[in-house]
């Protein structure tokens, strides 16, 4: 299907030609600036001076209009280039599904085995080197004779993958649709399938696993036809950040903390690198060192999966589960280096780091509960507490449940559905206008990069207080309802979630501006 890329190539070529034309026009405009704006009077009389002033004013107006035209031209070129990219992505998605169907058809009746590999945020089409690495380490040792291929997913996460782009929720939902189609095509062709998802790809697989579990018998693939391998899973039941704070919603990111990956009929293996901030987030966020270590682990540990040696993967620790009937195996890959100390390496002498790391690791581990079952969804808490439920008259719950639920819903609607979208769109619009103005004045690349990073970061920071209010209200309502229902354990858990969530959000609120400042000062993109 190579012909489908002809149009994007033409569009890209046109964008390149327009960019060259824009550069030529800018040079011509700049060359004409002084002769047209600083016209000298032909003589010393008032009439000559007035004529010179008139022509000079027209020249200045021309320069102003040229700057606006240049900014518009620049935006048009960028939009044209982006359109070509979007076209390629859409065609690649269709091609991926068609290729998958063709592969399945060619292997019909031959007992084919296919490994579908998904990428992470920012990698809609997994590169070959990445696929080869994860296949060798996580698929080949357990699934013999499988041929791997990459599956296109949007892999977007506004604002980190651009403005505009799909939110995390939208991207994962769309990716799950592609994955379901690919799985069903392969199974219909008589092939066995193993799905490998990394990071956002693991969240895509999580949605698909939930969907398959909801299908009636005879519609979903049988357990001997399908398996899953997940790496750096944000939905890890005991450690995934999307399961640590269930029900939390961050409107500025379009991100719902949608809970744990289910244990289904399909054999599943979940690999987690220790201190990966997405997949191994602390249970007790009151431990600030553990929080900061996990935040840095997003950068230093989350990308380790495809760089580990086969021996390191094989030495992973199989975590305990609640039942021998569990179909999911959870493997923790020990991290030899604390992410908290990684920025200091090369600056602080290694012997000193080696001296403090064991004690620091012991303190950080206090933020975790490694004794819990890996398959049990485990939300954040303040400290280990075990309280048995007591009986409370049920009429109390009936009296207060309705108004509290209404309050929770009202705050969520006002803040997340009404106020926050206005704030986000306003900041995006202001950033776009600043970018145009900067281009008009010929601002250096560092300035335009700073404006774009500001567009990405400011909505998160401005809307932070609203996220705290809605999260705290949600957990408080749940706590009171648990108390009214006689569930002191649930009451205690939800009360602990309030400060635990606040601490985690505040740590991120401090870390994001720091990372943004470094990116601006170094002229780099905000790291994703």
From Swiss-Prot:
Listed GO MF terms: carboxylic ester hydrolase activity
Residue ranges of domain PE in the record: 1-93
InterPro entries noted in UniProt: AB_hydrolase_fold (IPR029058), PE-PGRS_N (IPR000084), PE-PPE_C (IPR013228)
Topology of the protein relative to the lipid bilayer: Single-pass membrane protein
pH dependence: Optimum pH is 7.0-8.0.
Keywords linked to the UniProt accession: Hydrolase, Membrane, Serine esterase, Transmembrane, Transmembrane helix
Catalytic activity, EC: 3.1.1.-
Phenotype for residue 199 to A: Loss of activity
Regulation (activators, inhibitors): Esterase activity is significantly inhibited by the serine modifier phenylmethylsulfonyl fluoride (PMSF).
Signal peptide residues on this chain, from the entry's feature table: none
Substrates-to-products reaction catalysed: a hexanoate ester + H2O = an aliphatic alcohol + hexanoate + H(+); an octanoate ester + H2O = an aliphatic alcohol + octanoate + H(+); a butanoate ester + H2O = an aliphatic alcohol + butanoate + H(+)
Family that this chain belongs to: Belongs to the mycobacterial PE family.
Annotated protein name in UniProt: Esterase PE16
Organism name: Mycobacterium tuberculosis (strain ATCC 25618 / H37Rv)
Gene: PE16
């Amino acid at each position: 299907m190579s012909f489908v890329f002809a149009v994007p190539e033409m569009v890209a070529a046109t964008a390149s030609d327009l960019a060259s034309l824009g550069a030529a026009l800018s040079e011509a405009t700049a060359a004409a600036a002084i002769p047209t704006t600083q016209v000298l009077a032909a003589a010393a009389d008032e009439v000559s001076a007035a004529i010179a002033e008139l022509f000079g004013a027209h020249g200045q107006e021309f320069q102003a209009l040229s700057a606006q035209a240049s900014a518009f031209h620049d935006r048009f070129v960028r939009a044209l280039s982006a359109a070509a990219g979007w076209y390629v992505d859409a065609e690649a998605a269709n091609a991926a599904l068609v290729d998958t169907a063709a592969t399945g058809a060619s292997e019909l009746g031959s007992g084919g085995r296919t490994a579908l590999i998904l990428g992470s945020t920012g990698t809609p089409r997994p590169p070959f080197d990445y696929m080869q690495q994860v296949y060798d380490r996580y698929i080949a040792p357990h699934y013999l004779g499988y041929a791997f291929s990459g599956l296109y997913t949007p892999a977007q996460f506004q604002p980190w993958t651009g403005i505009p782009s799909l939110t995390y929720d939208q991207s994962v939902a769309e990716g799950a649709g592609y994955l379901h189609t690919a799985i069903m095509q392969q199974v219909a062709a008589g092939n066995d399938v193993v799905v490998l998802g990394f990071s956002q790809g693991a969240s895509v697989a999580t949605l698909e696993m939930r969907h398959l579990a909801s299908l009636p018998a005879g519609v979903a693939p049988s357990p001997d036809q399908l398996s899953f391998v997940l790496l750096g899973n944000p939905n890890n039941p005991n450690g995934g950040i999307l399961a640590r704070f269930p029900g939390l919603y961050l409107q500025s990111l379009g991100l719902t903390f949608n809970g744990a990956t289910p244990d289904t009929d399909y054999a599943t293996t979940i690999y987690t690198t220790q201190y990966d901030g997405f997949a191994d987030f602390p249970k007790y966020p009151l431990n600030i060192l553990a929080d900061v270590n996990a935040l840095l682990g997003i950068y230093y540990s989350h990308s380790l999966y495809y760089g580990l040696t086969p021996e390191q993967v094989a030495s992973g620790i199989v975590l305990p589960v609640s039942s021998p009937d569990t179909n999911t195996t959870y493997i923790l890959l020990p991290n030899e280096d604390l992410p908290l100390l990684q920025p200091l390496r090369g600056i602080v002498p290694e012997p000193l780091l080696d001296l403090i790391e064991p004690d620091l690791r012991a303190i950080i581990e206090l933020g975790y509960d490694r004794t819990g079952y890996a398959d049990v969804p485990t939300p954040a808490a303040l400290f280990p507490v075990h309280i048995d439920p007591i009986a409370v008259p049920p009429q109390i719950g009936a009296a207060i449940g309705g108004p509290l639920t209404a309050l929770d819903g009202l705050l969520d609607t006002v803040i997340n559905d009404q106020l926050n979208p206005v704030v986000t769109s306003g900041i995006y619009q202001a950033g776009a206008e600043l970018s145009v103005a900067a281009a008009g004045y010929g601002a250096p690349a560092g300035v335009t990069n700073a404006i774009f990073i500001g567009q990405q970061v400011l909505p998160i920071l401005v809307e932070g207080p609203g996220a705290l209010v809605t999260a705290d209200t949600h957990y408080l309502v749940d706590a009171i309802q648990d108390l009214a229902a006689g569930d002191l354990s649930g009451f205690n858990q939800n009360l602990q979630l309030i400060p635990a969530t606040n601490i985690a959000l505040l740590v991120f609120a401090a870390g994001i501006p720091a990372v943004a400042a470094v990116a601006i000062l170094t002229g780099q993109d905000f790291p994703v």
